[in-house]
């Protein structure tokens, strides 16, 4: 399993696993998408290239997931797979996903990615992210 769900007061969180920054960022994209919808029911039909910057790995995690959430809210497109390269405070990422079908039932409606309790620690094998619902 690449992630687990964390109960967090009125919010929800994820703990993702990986031993590199790239694994943690990619697994976080999948985990957040799977919190929103059952991604097993979607097929990859869209591809998007993004350059994400931040001062810290935690900034990049928040910026990356916020960008994925932007596409959900604005274009009704859910990106649920990512391939990426992390170097010098920059994440070069390709996102893969699908338009959200009209008849789909949302698991959770995520309003925002937060800095609350955030951690990105490949040396310890995990990253933690909390979302506002």
Swiss-Prot record:
Gene3D superfamilies for the chain: Archease domain
Pfam family membership, one: Archease
Superkingdom, taxonomy of origin: Archaea
Keyword list, A-Z: Calcium, Metal-binding, tRNA processing
Residues binding Ca(2+), per UniProt: 11, 132-133
One GO term of the biological process aspect: tRNA splicing, via endonucleolytic cleavage and ligation
A single MF term (Gene Ontology): calcium ion binding
Record family assignment: Belongs to the archease family.
HAMAP family, per the entry: Archease_arch
Biological function: Activates the tRNA-splicing ligase complex by facilitating the enzymatic turnover of catalytic subunit RtcB. Acts by promoting the guanylylation of RtcB, a key intermediate step in tRNA ligation. Can also alter the NTP specificity of RtcB such that ATP, dGTP or ITP is used efficiently.
Protein name: Protein archease
